[in-house]
């Protein structure tokens, strides 16, 4: 049986990052098309505005080459980056430094969210309550990346959020967590609408990730899989016996039968 391959963490030799002014028409870019930039190079001056108290300078956030300049609005930078893929996202695009707020299988607690998290993208196992989302938004957190959260809390929250596994309280994929832990403090771009977190690569940095490879692979017993059936959407488990079109999957100690078309192989 062939199943789609799900690569959660992928290195891309060519990625594009848009750096926008907080308010269109309010600011001036220093760079032009063809300019080479580094992550902490200033690329624009941003004057004081209602959403931007005090004059500031906008950094590139990534290293690469400016390939497009939209005067008074944005620039497009060609770079190399690592993409972390989720299954469900909500909210506007945001950016910030990665901050580990909880272990891969632990909840992001209210006590872990404080003023020091401002301008960060928080990472943890799962978000247990709506109050955590509300406090994170109140202190200036830019977004959350986690394994899952309750559907009701997800729907009521306004904070940009990327669920790597799905609804409920599944732990964050271990490979994803280990990668994000390794690059904690790195600037990242959260795009919930595209179900993706883009992590800038630093010059000379070597990440233990793979480039996009096979799209389908033969499902074998013992493989790590992700379930996309309604009752267990997004949960991870181990493939067991394959009988016709059905696959036995072990989930948290329980065994369920899932149609092969509703499984993805994790690599």
Task: Map each language-model feature to its residues.
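Well-ordered secondary-structure scaffolds
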Residues: 1-267
